[in-house]
Amino acid sequence: MSEKGRLFTSESVTEGHPDKICDAVSDSVLDALLAADPRSRVAVETLVTTGQVHVVGEVTTTAKEAFADITNIVRERILDIGYDSSDKGFDGASCGVNIGIGAQSPDIAQGVDTAHEARVEGAADPLDAQGAGDQGLMFGYAINDTPELMPLPIALAHRLSRRLTEVRKNGVLPYLRPDGKTQVTIAYEDRVPVRLDTVVISTQHADDIDLVKTLDPDIREQVLKTVLDDLAHDTLDASAVRVLVNPTGKFVLGGPMGDAGLTGRKIIVDTYGGWARHGGGAFSGKDPSKVDRSAAYAMRWVAKNVVAAGLAEGVEVQVAYAIGKAAPVGLFVETFGSEAVDPVKIEKAIGEVFDLRPGAIIRDLNLLRPIYAPTAAYGHFGRTDVDLPWERLDKVDDLKRAI
């Protein structure tokens, strides 16, 4: 343990990071297909590199026009991110776009369309007809660190990344470029955040910018100060924070020209910043029949309502599925000693209040609609800038009654 206390660090990246470009493209394709055919089965992966975008995967859909328009969808999303000129290292209008998409495997489809419960066990409930699209384990988490019930390090890192993009797009700092990363280190005492120790902000910029006289003071004033001024936290001391702006020096070569990007490579950024466990499955480009995505959203919904109900100060919940089965094969609740009631009772209440079959998750969270592109950057959880159904606190009273 450091003499400065227990230090925990989380990072975020901007929407112009190469991996996040890929997440954004994959989710934009998904949204376009769901808008035209809500029953679309989609698993789209994207790769970007210098001057090229490759979109591959499996899609089964009746949305023929949207499918035919994928190339334009890709270009529009890249341009919206801000890569609109070769001067920035990438141009959505002129980059090469290669599409290589096939149909969903019929072997997978049969397990999703006709679950084991209906196919073998003779279950008549319509929600028993849809099986999990894969085996796997998913985690959800919530903690009372912040009003949005997220761990403070990742919440603060995301706020900094969003602000980096905001000052670039609204012209406050027009010399910034789309690629960027943030990192936040916080000192804890007994799981309570007490001191902001270090903030790292690395941002792509135009070539003619003086790092010491222009970039460093601008980032401190327009990004960090703005975010910290808006941060209301009773226990956190930010008075002596160490700030590192572009600690490698200049950052002109960024985006896909600087690094290749892939869908699904920022799963810790997407979730809880390493504070909670992760089942390993990525989200972007997957329709909600894939429990990697829908069940992780459901677990966040569960965890957030448990904490909001006052049953624990922090909770992590795990669910597990077998491919082709509707009912989960496992549910696990961990409260880390912060519980107000017996964790066994919390687990029982969750089972009574939440239906965690894939079909029920999709129904209860209304997931068969184009809501995914905004989640491709700045996290899937704890968002206050977009209305996401898994962030609702609509089961608090039900949980209290079940306890």
UniProtKB/Swiss-Prot annotation:
One of its GO terms (molecular function) is magnesium ion binding. Binds 2 divalent ions per subunit. Its EC number is 2.5.1.6. It is an enzyme of class 2 (transferase). One of its GO terms (cellular component) is cytoplasm. Its cofactor is Mg(2+); K(+). Keywords: ATP-binding, Cytoplasm, Magnesium, Metal-binding, Nucleotide-binding, One-carbon metabolism, Potassium, Transferase. K(+) binds at E45. L-methionine binds at E58, Q104, D259, K290. It is found in: Cytoplasm. The keyword Metal-binding applies. ATP binds at H17, D179, G180, K181, K250, F251, D259, R265, K266, A282, K286. Mg(2+) binds at D19. GO terms for biological process: one-carbon metabolic process; S-adenosylmethionine biosynthetic process. Residues 104-114 are annotated as: Flexible loop. It catalyses: L-methionine + ATP + H2O = S-adenosyl-L-methionine + phosphate + diphosphate. Its main location: cytoplasm. Pathway: Amino-acid biosynthesis; S-adenosyl-L-methionine biosynthesis; S-adenosyl-L-methionine from L-methionine: step 1/1. InterPro entries: ADOMET_SYNTHASE_CS, S-AdoMet_synt_C, S-AdoMet_synt_central, S-AdoMet_synt_N, S-AdoMet_synthetase, S-AdoMet_synthetase_sfam. Belongs to the AdoMet synthase family. NCBIfam families: metK. Catalyzes the formation of S-adenosylmethionine (AdoMet) from methionine and ATP. The overall synthetic reaction is composed of two sequential steps, AdoMet formation and the subsequent tripolyphosphate hydrolysis which occurs prior to release of AdoMet from the enzyme. Homotetramer; dimer of dimers. This is S-adenosylmethionine synthase. It comes from Mycobacterium ulcerans (strain Agy99).
